[in-house]
Amino acid sequence: HRNIITQSKGFGMQKVRMIAQGRVQGVGFRWGVVTLALEIGGITGRVWNNDDGTVEILAQAESSAIMAKFIQEIRKGPTPFSKVTYLDVQLSNFPSYSDFKVAN
């Protein structure tokens, strides 16, 4: 899935839907994602826990380079105790957000 982002030389807004599996609930993962988005800058969206133990992220970035960095950092795990074993990344389309925050 990694090549989707780097190969699409997106002009303008890039939107992706990610589902993170692993040790991603109860370890500050959602807040880590929000902090990461703010640190990188130019990223807005939402993050929430799913009932199946995964975390879902809708993210939009000003460029594919910014999005690629965001995805790379999420794969590493945005908090010390989180561990992402699998990250599904797909190009997506959803209403634009003006900020990045936890949805639940």
List each model region and its residues:
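Intrinsically disordered, low-complexity, mixed-charge
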Residues: 3-104
